[in-house]
Structure formats: structure tokens, C-alpha cells
From Swiss-Prot:
GO biological process, one term: post-transcriptional regulation of gene expression
SUPFAM superfamilies for the chain: FinO-like
Organism, scientific name: Photorhabdus laumondii subsp. laumondii (strain DSM 15139 / CIP 105565 / TT01) (Photorhabdus luminescens subsp. laumondii)
Main location: cytoplasm
InterPro entries given in the database record: ProQ (IPR023529), ProQ/FinO (IPR016103), ProQ/FinO_sf (IPR036442), ProQ_C (IPR035236)
Taxonomic path: Bacteria, Pseudomonadati, Pseudomonadota, Gammaproteobacteria, Enterobacterales
Region (Disordered): 107-177
Pfam families linked to this entry: ProQ, ProQ_C
Coiled-coil regions listed in the entry: none
Annotated protein name in UniProt: RNA chaperone ProQ
GO annotation, cellular component aspect: cytosol
Biased composition (Basic and acidic residues): 115-137
Keyword Zinc belongs to the record: no
Family: Belongs to the ProQ family.
Length: 239
């Protein structure tokens, strides 16, 4: 068997893992949650190959598990799998909550980057338009003066000058005060919640909308607008 060529990038390593372990890794589409300790399992399986180092493998796994398609797969009811596709247990609520937080923060970063790019583009367009308007226009040559009137010509009386019209002052529109949004209130007693009630789930420094599906002993089972259902502890709930 020919030696595997040296893999230079994380994307090449992920493609190699998807080809070698197709029941565990996927190159496209929603990924399945990996078994805890999958790194050591991979090292033992490919220890005779010199196509990649442990450092490269660790970086590739970090890229794979932080991708949006992997974070979408970390949801309630999903099972972790080993290299052969065997189930290794259901995901814990803490891991689901952490994945949701990472996904929310990643989307926020992308939106901020896009807004910054649009602002820079508008600024460049405004600068270009300003430079175009500031360019001096070519002056027309002054008309030649006519020769002195002959004795037989009559001088025409000067035309009366029109008064310049005063520019109308724009009427200032009243500024409407923005409504003050009330700060969210943390939920202390989950027994007061009702099925279908709209609440908020605190994720990091921000919060997302959710609706109550079930009030359990270890927390409240809620559903997010994306359809993801999860169990959340009371300290993460707000009105």
C-alpha cells in the first residue's frame, strides 16, 4: 500500500478523516457529536501513518467541532458516536447549552463583520462622490465686448434686477422619544411558569426568546425559535 501524502491543512485532515471513518466524520452536511476522547482513538488507529502530526490532528478537530454544522448537530436527543459509528451515550444539557452559546456568538460575530464591511463600503462611496463634486469645472471664455455705439445708436436702459428669493427655512420635525425597554427579570420560582408561556433564555451576555414546553424537577424544558428543544436551569431563565 502506498504511503499517504503529507496533509498540510486542517481541511485536508478533515477530508481524510471523513474518508477513513465515514460513520463518524462527514465532509458536508450536519455533523454528528463525537465521542469524548476521540482524539486518542484516532491516534491509535493511524499510529503507523506519517501523513499528519498530533498537533495538526488536534487543530483539525478543534476546527471541526467549532463549525456551525457541528454545533447544529449538538441538540437534544442526539447521540455521541465513536470512529465506527457506534452510539456512546446521549448528550448532556450542559454540552447542548454550551454549543448553543458558541453558535449564537459566532452568528453575532459574522453579523458584526458584515455590518462593518457595509459601513466601510458606504464610506468609500461617499468619499469618491465628494472628490468628484470638488473637481473644478472649466471656465467659459468671457464674451468679447462690442465696439462703442455709433452716434446714431440709442443706448438701451438697464434692466431692473430681480430680488433674490429668500430660501425657506426647513421646519424642524419634533423628535420622538424612544420607548424605554424594561430590563429582563430573572425567574426564581419555576412552578409559576405555564406551558406555552413566552420567556427568555440567557446565553452568555445576551438572551434569546423561548417558549415553555415542560416544567421538570431539574429545570424547564423550552423550545427556541429555531426549533431546538433543551432543558435549562432556573438561573438562566428571564421574563
Amino acid at each position: 500500500m502506498e504511503n499517504q501524502p503529507k496533509l498540510n491543512s486542517s481541511k485536508e485532515i478533515i477530508a481524510f478523516l471523513a474518508e477513513r471513518f465515514p460513520l463518524c466524520f462527514v465532509a458536508e452536511g450536519e455533523a454528528r457529536p463525537l465521542k469524548i476522547g476521540i482524539f486518542q482513538d484516532i491516534v491509535e488507529r493511524i499510529q503507523d501513518e506519517e501523513c499528519l502530526s498530533k498537533t495538526q490532528l488536534r487543530s483539525a478537530l478543534r476546527l471541526y467541532t467549532s463549525s456551525w454544522r457541528y454545533l447544529y448537530g449538538v441538540k437534544e436527543g442526539a447521540q455521541r458516536v465513536d470512529l465506527d459509528g457506534n452510539s456512546c451515550g446521549e448528550l448532556e444539557a450542559e454540552h447542548i447549552e454550551h454549543a448553543l452559546q458558541q453558535l449564537t456568538e459566532a452568528k453575532a460575530r459574522v453579523q458584526a463583520q458584515r455590518a462593518e464591511q457595509r459601513a466601510k463600503k458606504r464610506e468609500a462611496e461617499n468619499v469618491a462622490a465628494g472628490e468628484k463634486n470638488e473637481r473644478p469645472t472649466a471656465k467659459k471664455p468671457a464674451p468679447r465686448r462690442r465696439a462703442n455705439n455709433t452716434e446714431g445708436e440709442k443706448r438701451q436702459p438697464p434692466r431692473p434686477q430681480k430680488r433674490p428669493q429668500q430660501a425657506r427655512k426647513p421646519v424642524a420635525k419634533p423628535v420622538q422619544a424612544k420607548p424605554i425597554q424594561a430590563a429582563p427579570i430573572q425567574i426564581v420560582d419555576v412552578s409559576s411558569l405555564k406551558i406555552g408561556q413566552e420567556i427568555k433564555v440567557r446565553v452568555g451576555k445576551s438572551s434569546v426568546d423561548a417558549s415553555v414546553l415542560e416544567v421538570a424537577k431539574d429545570g424547564v424544558r423550552v423550545q427556541l425559535p429555531s426549533g431546538l428543544a433543551m432543558i435549562v436551569r432556573a438561573e438562566h431563565l428571564q421574563f
